[in-house]
Amino acid sequence: MKFAVIVFPGSNCDVDMFHAIKDELGEEVDYVWHDTENLDEYDAILLPGGFSYGDYLRCGAISRFANAMKAVQKAAEQGKPILGVCNGFQILVESGLLPGALMRNENLKFMCRTVQLRVENNETMFTSQYEKDEVINIPIAHGEGNYYCDEETLKQLEENNQIAFRYVENPNGSVSDIAGIVNEKGNVLGMMPHPERAVDELLGGAEGLKVFQSILKQWRETYVVNA
């Protein structure tokens, strides 16, 4: 399986994402610059955290216009797994690939610590290796991770089982304790916590690795078993 890590000016979690795929998952991965127009050779697309374009205007508001995002949109339409973490989640929302918005944290402070997440839906291509309602420890590092959507959108997210992760103790004011959501098709996941920072027991824990293992399992079942 071949992954692409999209690198925007100001990305700073691309190396962590690359490490998670290459060294922990053992799969092929490339850094792909934001002006790339073709992602056809890749099986999965990863949008890392950071401060793309300095977070000017709004987080992700400029990155949504990058050439690579047109290719990401195409990949999403093809059903390829798209994972956006932190700033990557913000970019997915700004691009319209996921509903809602991400606002300043309720306490107006940057937060950097490990939090507990509850797996709300383990039937997605990103969460299949977790148990339903499993509680995992994953780091957060954001100033604008307060997820918001209107009541109608929240109702749709809940009815369609699109809420992948919830905070056990809400750190930022996110509506309904939401930490991560998928699109209706189930192949685009956006989450504020950083699973790529929790892939090695020597570095504090590996409870985020199952996100990437789930992607790999889905791909193998789809393309290897049926080959």
Swiss-Prot record:
Predominant cellular place of this UniProt entry's protein:
cytoplasm
Lineage: superkingdom: Bacteria
Compartment list:
Cytoplasm
The Glutamine amidotransferase type-1 domain covers 3-225
Tell me which EC number(s) this protein carries. Answer: 6.3.5.3, 3.5.1.2
SUPFAM superfamilies reported in the protein's UniProt record:
Class I glutamine amidotransferase-like
The active site lies at 86 (nucleophile), 194, 196
GO biological process entries = 'de novo' IMP biosynthetic process
GO molecular function annotation = ATP binding; glutaminase activity; phosphoribosylformylglycinamidine synthase activity
Alphabetically sorted, this entry's keywords are: ATP-binding, Cytoplasm, Glutamine amidotransferase, Hydrolase, Ligase, Nucleotide-binding, Purine biosynthesis
Which reaction(s) does the protein catalyse, per the Swiss-Prot or TrEMBL entry?
N(2)-formyl-N(1)-(5-phospho-beta-D-ribosyl)glycinamide + L-glutamine + ATP + H2O = 2-formamido-N(1)-(5-O-phospho-beta-D-ribosyl)acetamidine + L-glutamate + ADP + phosphate + H(+); L-glutamine + H2O = L-glutamate + NH4(+)
Entry's PROSITE patterns?
GATASE_TYPE_1
- Name any GO cellular component annotation: cytoplasm
Q: What does this protein do?
A: Part of the phosphoribosylformylglycinamidine synthase complex involved in the purines biosynthetic pathway. Catalyzes the ATP-dependent conversion of formylglycinamide ribonucleotide (FGAR) and glutamine to yield formylglycinamidine ribonucleotide (FGAM) and glutamate. The FGAM synthase complex is composed of three subunits. PurQ produces an ammonia molecule by converting glutamine to glutamate. PurL transfers the ammonia molecule to FGAR to form FGAM in an ATP-dependent manner.
PANTHER family per the UniProt record, alphabetical: PHOSPHORIBOSYLFORMYLGLYCINAMIDINE SYNTHASE SUBUNIT PURQ (PTHR47552:SF1)
- Spell out the protein name for this chain: Phosphoribosylformylglycinamidine synthase subunit PurQ
Organism of derivation: Bacillus anthracis
Question: Which gene is transcribed and translated to give this protein?
Answer: purQ
